[in-house]
From Swiss-Prot:
This is Ion-translocating oxidoreductase complex subunit D. Pfam families: NQR2_RnfD_RnfE. It comes from Mannheimia succiniciproducens (strain KCTC 0769BP / MBEL55E). The complex is composed of six subunits: RnfA, RnfB, RnfC, RnfD, RnfE and RnfG. Its cofactor is FMN. InterPro entries: NqrB/RnfD, RnfD_bac. The gene is rnfD. Its EC number is 7.-.-.-.
Amino acid sequence: MFKIASSPHSHSGKLTARIMLWVILAMLPAIFAQLYYFGFGVLFQITIAVVFALCLEFLVTILRKKPKLFYISDFSVTLTALILAVAIPPYAPYWIILIGIFCAVILGKHVYGGLGQNPFNPAMVGYVVLLVSFPMQMTTWLAPVQLLHEPPTFIDAYHLIFSGGTTDGFSLHQLTASIDGMSSATPLDAVKTGLKANRGLAEINRSPLFTQSSLAGLGWFQVNLAFLLGGLFLVWKRIIHWQIPTALLITVCLFSLCSWLFSDNMPSPLWQLFSGATMFCAFFIATDPVTASITPKGKLVFGVLVGLLLCLIRFYGGYPDGAAFAILLANICVPLIDQYTRPRVTGYDLRGKN
């Protein structure tokens, strides 16, 4: 069972709704960056996710005979929907986000009793279910609109998501057919696939996805930078603690530094920090106050564990990015981490004797 630290206790004065709103506000720069580089599909995914999540939350509270307004007005389900919506490919079919939200809200949250009682991050539960069940849809990304000869319009985005093709009859794959095939993959996927095909890193970096950006791939670097700025804002506002993102990013940096120094075909540590979901994971997912460690030392251990698992899966696993799996695996370890990192009670030594 989870344990509560010994008194005295202090109240932070921060309401759940206020915390959630600050986090949503901090995500806006990254959402705008994603919208600029990856098109209008982002808006559709967010709208579908938030509306369906609120409706599902309303229905579940009725079935569980819980206060409906109380659960919806804390914005927790809105944040869950927002996190999942920006994590999936912007032009994924509409039913992908519907299934993901259902799994996040039901399997990731209410099965365990609701907010505050779930051991796993709900958004990552939904994401992993989607990634394992629908790998093709979850790994097909449209190239940044700056690389496309005819970027999808708002109407095209609607038709791509709801019918699988634009008004002119082009599918998602056909939109990137005139560009190097690497451009339809994420930078992490492009590098991993290229290395498996015995292509050198220098050759991979000549792809249009990399030539128009100095670091980590066009669009992806900018989105990660926006998440970093939003995360630093949350640390400054004391909405999240500094230990988890700091420990996570240092671990990723050190792990990638060792790989980079001993191999010419490994991207630099800076590349690893600003690619994939690294910054998103460090500041907005791993810092979930419900599913992360609650002790000061435990937060450091938790951050290191997430960073280590992320790198192991990213470098040696079958998936290009291991953020979601790293979070869920680390969530399993939280009770054990908290058990062995509890602060010493005032007036007692480490053995528990006064």
